[in-house]
C-alpha cells in the first residue's frame, strides 16, 4: 500500500495546475476529487514503511483553516521539514500541516517529509 500526499506552498498557474492533475492521474495516485482545490508546489508518494518518518502537526480544512478533531490526525513528532523534487527544489518551513483527505470535493492533503 502506498501513502500519497501533497506539500502545499503556493497557488500555481492554470498550466501548472493541469500538469499536477495529469501527474496524479498518470501515476494513479489519489483520485482527482481529493485535489479539487489545488494549491500545490510539490506532489510526492512514499512507501507505507516510511509513515513513521512523517511529521504531522495538525489537520485542517483548506477552505476555512478549521482544525479537525484530533481523531482525524495524529501528532507523531515535530521536526524541520524540507522536501526536494525534480520539479521544485525548495526548503519549506519547519512546521508543516497534514490534511487527512476524505472523499469529498475541496479536500486535499498537506504533508512534510522529515
UniProtKB/Swiss-Prot annotation:
More info: There are 3 tandem-duplicated genes coding for this protein in S.cerevisiae (YLR156W, YLR159W and YLR161W). Additionally, a fourth copy has been disrupted by a Ty1 retrotransposon, which led to the prediction of the 2 dubious ORFs YLR157W-D and YLR157W-E.
Name listed for the protein in its UniProt record: Putative uncharacterized protein YLR156W
Amino acid at each position: 500500500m502506498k501513502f500519497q500526499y501533497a506539500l502545499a506552498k503556493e497557488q500555481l498557474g492554470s498550466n501548472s495546475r493541469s500538469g499536477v492533475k495529469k501527474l496524479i492521474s498518470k501515476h494513479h495516485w489519489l483520485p482527482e476529487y481529493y485535489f479539487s482545490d489545488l494549491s500545490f508546489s510539490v506532489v510526492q508518494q512514499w512507501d507505507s514503511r516510511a509513515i513513521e518518518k512523517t511529521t504531522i502537526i495538525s489537520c485542517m480544512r483548506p477552505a476555512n483553516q478549521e482544525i479537525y478533531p484530533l481523531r482525524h490526525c495524529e501528532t507523531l513528532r515535530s521536526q524541520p521539514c524540507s522536501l526536494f523534487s525534480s520539479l521544485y527544489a525548495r526548503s519549506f518551513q519547519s512546521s508543516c500541516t497534514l490534511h487527512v483527505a476524505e472523499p469529498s470535493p475541496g479536500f486535499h492533503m498537506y504533508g512534510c517529509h522529515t
